[in-house]
Amino acid sequence: MDASMVPRVPHKVGVVGYGRLGQSLVSRLLAQGSELGLELVFVWNRDPGRMAGSVPPALQLEDLTTLEERHPDLVVEVAHPKIIHESGVQILRHANLLVGSPSALADQTTERQLLEASNHWGHTVFVARGALWGCEDISRLDAAGGLQSLRVTMATHPDGFRLEGPLAAAHSSGPRTVLYEGPVRGLCPLAPRNSNTMAAAALAAPSLGFDRVIGVLVADLSLTDMHVVDVELTGPQGPQAAALPCTPTERTQPSLALSLAPLLLQPSGTAYWAAVSFPPDLGSASAEFPPLPLLSP
């Protein structure tokens, strides 16, 4: 029989988290997954009541520790960094893992444990790049030794932040206030939901990493329905240097935290869908979600 005539075995996907991104991803998997050889085998949420009426009961997973019973090939985390801290190792025992909350990897213990689990069980960790575009270019420049500094600034309305620790008490002192400026490693535990783009940058540039990539968090009262991400790269200086000593770029997109319009879910939801549709370890590579080489077996 012609190989093209052989039915393709669908890749089994589990989704951890049923917030806005999780809902978008689950909806598209149910509607279009079979066309791309993907089968949704479970959805887990810390509050199971949120899935009532929208996720078929047979797909609702009550206990995340029993995920192996669903035999997933890939588990997509779109919940909170705590899930990676608490359950990342267990997930890797049974499946590949797509981390939608890369700020979790700022914790060195978590990163080490995931590396060990990946090597031991032969499963791979993939990382969502979120709003970080040009991720491949950053990685190539870093690998070539041409990246001296990397700075990522994220600005949005103060109501768009979900801050913890000392930053939780931070207040805007004017129309535009810098809440944090420093190493991304220090920012991630204080703003776990608002630092994922910066964490993705730190992972894309391992020579700098979480300690040398600079993250800046800005509260801007004028940004009522969007957030703005600025990425600034600095390359080598001098006569032998590349022609691009400093490159600032900016991206503006709707803010999911503030917007009530369902259509504004599309930018992030589409990115996650692209990653699951073509997971690098399971088929065609996806530029949206480059794998984490250090966490690949």
From Swiss-Prot:
Q: What name is this protein filed under?
A: Aspartate dehydrogenase domain-containing protein
Species source reads Rattus norvegicus
| Positions of post-translational Phosphoserine modification | S24, S172
Biological process terms from the Gene Ontology for this record are: NAD biosynthetic process
Instruction: Tell me the PANTHER family matching this sequence.
Output: ASPARTATE DEHYDROGENASE DOMAIN-CONTAINING PROTEIN, L-ASPARTATE DEHYDROGENASE-RELATED
Keyword line:
Phosphoprotein
Please state which protein family the record places this protein in: Belongs to the L-aspartate dehydrogenase family.
Please provide, alphabetically and separated by semicolons, the GO molecular function terms listed in this UniProt record.
aspartate dehydrogenase activity; NADP binding
Fetch the Pfam families from UniProt: Asp_DH_C, NAD_binding_3
